[in-house]
């Protein structure tokens, strides 16, 4: 008796499955096709992204080789084009190359390119903080106190690995201008931090012991 009931239940269940498949056949086929298409598009996107990265690397390497070979025609414009690609690797590298080799000397234009990389390029958090720090370092010789702090505040008010670097830059900024009270405040912050750069902490402690 139990076997007959089990057989009936099995047959009923199988019949329900058949009916469901029959009724929803088109929906199932469409869903499978849509899922397959999404997978294909995803891998196609990755392939296109990888090819774009390779081409960008080739462009950047070609520019730097030509520059070092003293072929400097249109170097600035070509590097700016790479910056405007908003690539997480080669846009910052192109900006650094422009600055380090003094290809671009107008401060306003350089700061615009810094902002382009910082605000429009998808970067890892600490890479972004590094670029913000580099912007502060670049501007530290000619900006006012409030302007420099405005640049570095996103790092100073965070727990970034670059926080001690930013604090040290501000401390040295005030020290070079003879503002020892303000300078000491930032050296003290560095020494009192738990998670900081050991070298910067040591240099800050030396400065405090020697000059305050």
Label the model's feature ranges.
Residues 1-37:
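N-terminal positive-inside, membrane-proximal cytosolic segments immediately preceding the first
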Residues 2, 10, 54-60, 69-76:
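Acidic, proline-/serine-/threonine-rich low-complexity intrinsically disordered segments
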Residues 38-58:
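Transmembrane signal-anchor/signal-peptide helices with a preference for the extracytoplasmic
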Residues 47, 83-85, 119-123:
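Flexible helix-coil transition and linker loops at the boundaries of alpha-helical arrays
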Residues 62-93:
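Short extracytoplasmic
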């Amino acid at each position: 008796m139990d076997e007959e009931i089990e057989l009936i239940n099995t047959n009923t269940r199988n019949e329900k499955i058949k009916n469901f498949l029959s009724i929803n056949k088109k929906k199932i086929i469409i869903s499978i096709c849509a899922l397959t298409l999404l997978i294909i598009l995803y891998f196609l996107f990755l392939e296109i992204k990888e090819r774009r990265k390779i081409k960008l690397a080739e462009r950047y390497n070609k520019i730097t080789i030509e520059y070092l070979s003293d072929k400097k025609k249109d170097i600035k414009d070509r590097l700016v084009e790479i910056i405007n690609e908003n690539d997480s690797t080669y846009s910052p590298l192109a900006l650094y190359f422009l600055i380090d080799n003094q290809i671009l000397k107008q401060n306003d234009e350089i700061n615009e390119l810094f902002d382009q990389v910082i605000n429009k390029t998808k970067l890892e958090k600490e890479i972004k903080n590094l670029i913000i720090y580099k912007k502060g370092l670049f501007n530290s010789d000619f900006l006012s106190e409030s302007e420099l702090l405005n640049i570095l505040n996103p790092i100073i008010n965070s727990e970034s690995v670059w926080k001690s670097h930013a604090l040290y830059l501000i401390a040295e900024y005030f020290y070079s201008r003879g503002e020892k009270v303000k300078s000491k405040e930032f050296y003290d912050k560095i020494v009192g931090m738990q998670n900081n750069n050991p070298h910067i902490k040591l240099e800050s402690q030396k400065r405090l012991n020697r000059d305050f």
